Amino acid sequence: MTSLRRGNICWVAVCAALLTLTRGIDVIAKPSRTPSNGDVQLVGGASPAEGRVEVFYNGAWGTVCDDGWEMQDAQIVCKQLGFASANSTRCCASFGQGTGVIILDDLACTGDETRIGDCPHRGWEQHNCAHTEDAGVVCNGKVRLAGSPNPLQGRLEIFHEGEWGTVCDSDWDLKDASVVCRQLGYPSANSSSNVSFGPASTAQILLDRVSCMGDEHGVEYCEHGDWKNVSADCTHSRDAGVICTRPIRLVGGNGPMQGRVEILHNGEWGSVCDKGWSFQNAVVVCNQLGATQPRRPQGVPVGGGVGPTHMSFVNCDGTEATLEQCSNSGWGNAGECGHSNDAGVICTPAVRLVGGNTHIEGRVEVFNNGQWGSICPESWDAKDAEVACRQLGNYPLAEGDCCPQFPADVGVVLDNVVCTGNESRIQDCAHQDWGVVDCSGGQAAGAKCQATVQLVGGSHPLEGNVIVLRNGRWGSICDDNWDINDARVVCRQLGNYEAVAATCCAKYGQVPQEIILDDVACQGEEGRIEDCYHATWGSHNCGGSESAGVVCREIRLALDDSSSNLPKGRVEIVYNGVWGRICGTDWDLNDANVLCRQLYNSTAESVHSFKNGSGPILLSNFKCTGSESNIFDCTHNPWGDYTCDDADAAVVCRGGLRLAGGRTPLEGRVEVFHDGQWGTVCDDGWDLLDAKVVCTQLGNYEALSAKCCANFGQGTGPILIDGLACNGNEDLIEDCRHEGWGSHNCQHYEDAGVVCTDLRLTHENGSVSTNTLTGRVEVLSSSGEWGAICGKYWDKKDAEVVCQQLFNTSAMDTRKFYLSSPDQLINMGEVQCNGSESLLLQCPRASKPFTAQTCPGGETAGVLCKDIRLVSGNQREFGAVELLVDSQWGSICADNWGPNEGAVACKQLGYCAAKGTQKGLQPARTQGKMHFSSMNCTGSESRLRDCVHTYGGYTCNGLVFEAVVQCKAGCDWPGPIRHGSFSPNRSSYDPLTTIDVKCDAGYELMGSKTLQCVTGCDWSRPTPECQRISNCSIGGGGKPSVGAQAGPAGGVMLIIGIILGAVVMMLIACVALYLKGRNKNIGRGNPATTSAIWKPKKEFDELKEPVLSFSAMTAGGAGPEDGMGEDI
């Protein structure tokens, strides 16, 4: 090793040693000179201004006993160290136990001494103490913040040589401010500010050109200019200021105002035990964080912390400024409280947006000293608005017009707000003192935030699958554990709407966005869905058909009589997140009928008068015809017309009806409203006549089927009706005969359900198609008439929606039907579905009416829906056969399953033919729904339903219970072909594929040059052959003729030519090898030898061309993929 290397290693060792020595040193406040007897230092504190008191005596540091330890003693220690004064005393080894000698005991300072050794005491090293009694002190540091009532921010003042002064802001930045904040006991700085705090200082400017690295223990240890020697341009208008972060935070929640409570102590964050945790404790935490009242004092899902537990048994009365001022167990005395008992809170943000079109845009109002006030718009920009949106609930700032101005309808309380954009709250930004404003024009600052939740796929804006915004991308929510409490939060987040239903199973179509939220568990009181407990973002075990959805409502009845048999009450509506009333002027039975139909699928018993509510009057003068489906479709005065001299609008509805748990709005469990509550209907005697009345009441729909046995899930309320016996002509379900309200002998597993429809399929002759999944599509009009759909623009996406709505299956193809008569009714035209809608009526469509005469081409729309599938197979063409019956998939018993049945199944599935059939899958699967116990086909049928069959699978037994088929999707490989190949060369080919056939050199094709895979998975022609060319004509320029007789001379000449060519090639090779060997030997000075000419095989291998090629004599036909064939 060179001396330079040794030198480098030595330097590395020295640097490493120095780095090790400088790490982990306690924060110690002590003189920089060599200590002498009576010097003091503070050890073990989080800053130089606090710690265990240690005194130097007889060459060693020792501690002070806390017997008689008081503020006068602490004042002398702090002044001796250069601090302005003492803040508090600490006993009982609060900063840890020392290890040296106990130097002093029974101190009794008067306050006039300059050094601790001058105070009366028991005597040096005289004591009756242990290190558990070591005294400590907290000094008022050498820095303070002035000019602001907020202890976290202000003008920086520094203590030097007995006086306080300011610091010039030259070179002042966030690193300098962070050092000051840590020196004051705060975690770090939010910003370094030069905003004026309070009246201008009159103190001397002590420092300028401060330049901290960021890790110093105090600002005085940073690089800076000479004390009291500052630049001439440093005036008090340039006094440096800071805004510090709080020594308390919320961690582990889903927003800045919720989570596990953590506090900073001795430079370390730690949690608080929830033993004795109360609402008053949460109030103090929220006040300390600058928020308003807590939403929920306990039970917040916050996860476990990882640091120490600083405090336990906290007991606040709600008036304390900080949590540590409340009575508690003492720092670090948490007992056996683990992190499973960490306390948490959810605080209400001290900001709100008022006067906008939604709850997330409007005038910014902040809460301070018990009242709300607005902000002056001067200097207000996107960074300020960004902080407001974050504080409101982690909303991103809307793109475009982020910062509109609004009328200052409440007093302006804040001016000159300057945010960096990183703050959590507006109150943490630099600003003028509260109430000190210079703002004119009557305007206030505003913000427009971007919504983080949307509904997609619904027929109106207040229903659909839920998607949420996370880190700039939208994603869906899995429906695991999804319930009405989750829906309440989503509807509130969308605009304080009322939740009607929580939906599952991608009810409004599959969402293209990936699932990013799962296992949501809201209490129902949260402000945002993100605030609810949920699995880790992006973690889920769901598929695309499990998207969660909601149905919200912007209108409701404030029921004034819960004992009433009928739904009745004051009508309330929501606008911009605020619920209000409708003026009763001109409110009549037509208006009431529309409302009752909209809310309860019923009619109005009467209009009614109730005592007025407390919300604003939002609408008035409704003039409905009675045929509208939504109260807002009626004419009325503009929003915000508050003139009303009448009572509030109110109604009494005749009962109520709704469907729950269905895949579409037209199917589900039947629920009725009676005696102030919703309940179910028992399926005893439930039939299609009962279903017909339900579907008619819901909107003149046609009943497709009556469902029993809680087909749409079990209800949870009372069972209100049993033994229903409708004749089919009633208008309302309560008009039918039944056992009496609430009288039943049923359980919820007997809840009745229905499937209604506004679609049907008909045959070409107009008859209704009841047992097939193909036919002309007809739509039910609002007047109750069935009509066709013009087929001009009908495509596969439209057909997909129809098949999903009617049968919960996909579309195999579209169909077109000619008009059955010139007078045939057409109800719809130019449908433009995207394929994800759950109802055809949700698709965009032309508003212009169509008739048989105006429908282009005279064709109507039809569909062919898929009613067969293969499941549980390991490949696409193989599996157990399942058929769709009554919207349910079920299998076929394999007892009579054979080649004929397999051929029909494959034909129906769209395959060419069946390769084979078998009974049961391996491994066997659990037996599910079985539709057919036998199936007997001739093989000529187009569908399995056309075969002779028996419904039900009760007689099918054993592990091989289900029919399985292997279908052919195309033609097999047509080879092998000897001495030839196919292009393309594959193991199988799709129908209508054409392949080329080629022969090797010396062979000629006998047959067609192409083959095509035709219907039935057969090739269009037999596979051709390649035959050897037996003779060639020489010199004639003609094509070799297979089988032609050449003369003897021609044959002899051919053989002689081949032999002579071979001899010439060998001679050339020998000469080349000779010359190569000779040159090598000459280069070495050795004579050429025979062995140098005749080298081993390797040198022949190095030749660029082969001597002779026999490939044409040995090539065979190529097989699929490998290109190899057989040798002769």
Swiss-Prot record:
| Pfam name, any one | Sushi
Identify the tissues in which this protein is expressed: From the mid-gastrula stage, expressed only in mesenchyme cells that are migrating toward the body wall. At the brachiolaria stage, expressed in presumptive coelomocytes of the coelomic pouch. Also expressed in adult coelomocytes (at protein level).
The residue range of the signal peptide is 1-24
Q: Which UniProt keywords apply?
A: Cytoplasmic vesicle, Disulfide bond, Glycoprotein, Immunity, Innate immunity, Membrane, Phagocytosis, Repeat, Signal, Sushi, Transmembrane, Transmembrane helix
Name what induces it. Answer: By bacterial challenge in adult coelomocytes.
Residue intervals annotated with topology Extracellular: 25-1051
> Some GO term, biological process aspect, for this entry: which one?
phagocytosis
Q: Where in the cell is it found?
A: Cytoplasmic vesicle membrane
Q: Which positions fall inside the Sushi domain?
A: 969-1028
Q: What positions does the domain SRCR occupy? A: 40-140, 143-245, 248-348, 351-450, 453-553, 555-654, 657-757, 759-866, 868-968
Glycosylation site positions: 87, 190, 194, 229, 422, 601, 612, 765, 808, 834, 936, 985, 1031
Topological domains on the Cytoplasmic side lie at 1073-1128
Q: Which GO terms describe its cellular component?
A: cytoplasmic vesicle membrane
Instruction: List the cysteine pairs that form cystine.
Output: 65-129, 78-139, 109-119, 168-234, 181-244, 212-222, 273-337, 286-347, 316-326, 376-439, 389-449, 419-429, 478-542, 491-552, 522-532, 583-644, 596-653, 624-634, 682-746, 695-756, 726-736, 803-865, 833-843, 906-967, 937-947, 971-1013, 999-1026
Say where the protein is mainly found: membrane
**Membrane-topology annotation of the record:** Single-pass type I membrane protein
* Sequence intervals crossing the membrane: 1052-1072
- Role played: Involved in aggregate formation and phagocytosis by larval mesenchyme cells and adult coelomocytes. Binds to bacteria and may act as an opsonin in the innate immune system.
According to UniProt, the name of this protein is: Scavenger receptor cysteine-rich domain superfamily protein
- Gene coding for it: SRCR1
